[in-house]
Amino acid sequence: MSKLAIETIGLRKKFGNQVVLDGIDMQVPAGTIYALLGPNGAGKTTLIHILSTLYDQDDGIVKIAGYDLATDKDMVRQSISLTGQFAAVDEVLTGEENLRMLCRLSGLTAAESRSRTEELLRHFDLAAAAKKRVKTYSGGMRRRLDIAISLVVKRPILFLDEPTTGLDTISRRSLWQIILQLKEQGITVFLTTQYLEEADQLADIITVIDSGRVVATGTAKSLKSSIGGEVIEIRNEKDEIVRTAATSGTLLDMNQALNELTQSLSPTMRVSIRKPSMDDVFIALTSQEMERAPS
């Protein structure tokens, strides 16, 4: 596979008169976890649908595993797996039956299907629930089964569209460990998420899009440092943040920011200083707030 698992140049897509993606340039190195952040309606799902061959682009170049999406779509499909926002499993069947059925549909023999099913059940911590109907599974178990199904045939690139939406903290962190293990196996993971902590914890590279355009790309550390060295917060008596400002961290800059922040405020309000977070990055880049993961 190419050193770049995914590359887009000037990617554009519109529906009717609405421009959804407007000149997206991305480079996803092979073997990395790459996170796409953006508010609702930013174009995340449309982009992942194009990259996974579900939609055609209107303009631009898209290469997946070195293959041009416009001319080598069949080869692209043989290089990717996709797990969407909603679990695509048969709730009447057991977890084992779901996996074995997909193995057979993928062309594996009965013996190969049995072996691959057992392997995936172990890897995704579903062996104990293998013979239980999926309708009895928790949300986290369903998501793990859904990802396992997408990996029945081993492919170098996995697309995950908001994989932990709706999961509780324990299930979400369990899935994070599985995603990190997939990276260790050499799989490139391209995920979209609404959760800033998820991108911060998992991603080697993060791209932020807003209104169909890339507004920033970098590591979590570089994105945080790009907005300043320290963040000043002013809190009221109820411990609510009433004002905030990112600063370079120098005494001169912090004094100036404090003077501006504290104008016309009660002297009883408290000041705190912290390092920038992904929340600060996102708000600075998009003027919107992302959804916080449930705790």
Where are these regions (language model features)?
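Conserved ABC transporter NBD signature motif
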Residues: 60-71, 75-76
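Catalytic Walker B motif of ABC-type/P-loop ATPase nucleotide-binding domains
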Residues: 158-162
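Short, charged/small-residue-rich alpha-helical element at the C-terminal edge
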Residues: 222-295
